[in-house]
């Protein structure tokens, strides 16, 4: 049952990781826009 538990953790972490990368990229993009202005 350990494999199922780890699989559940991975499935739970993937959306969080993608969301974190998206937010970080968005903040860097906004910060770049402000620097250009």
From Swiss-Prot:
GO aspect biological process, one term: cytochrome complex assembly
Keyword flag Thylakoid: yes
Membrane disposition: Single-pass membrane protein
Keyword set, alphabetical order: Chloroplast, Electron transport, Membrane, Photosynthesis, Plastid, Thylakoid, Transmembrane, Transmembrane helix, Transport
Record Pfam families: PetG
SUPFAM superfamilies the UniProt entry points to: PetG subunit of the cytochrome b6f complex
Localization annotation: Plastid, Chloroplast thylakoid membrane
InterPro entries in the cross-refs: Cyt_6/f_cplx_su5, Cyt_6/f_cplx_su5_sf
TM region(s), chain numbering: 5-25
A Gene Ontology term for the protein's cellular component: cytochrome b6f complex
GO molecular function: electron transporter, transferring electrons within cytochrome b6/f complex of photosystem II activity
Keyword Membrane set for record: yes
Subunit structure, interactors included: The 4 large subunits of the cytochrome b6-f complex are cytochrome b6, subunit IV (17 kDa polypeptide, PetD), cytochrome f and the Rieske protein, while the 4 small subunits are PetG, PetL, PetM and PetN. The complex functions as a dimer.
Recorded family membership: Belongs to the PetG family.
General function of this protein: Component of the cytochrome b6-f complex, which mediates electron transfer between photosystem II (PSII) and photosystem I (PSI), cyclic electron flow around PSI, and state transitions. PetG is required for either the stability or assembly of the cytochrome b6-f complex.
Name of the protein: Cytochrome b6-f complex subunit 5
Species this chain originates from: Platanus occidentalis (Sycamore)
């Amino acid at each position: 049952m350990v494999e199922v538990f780890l699989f559940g953790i991975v499935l739970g972490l993937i959306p969080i990781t993608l969301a974190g990368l998206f937010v970080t990229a968005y903040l860097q993009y906004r910060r770049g826009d402000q620097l250009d202005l």
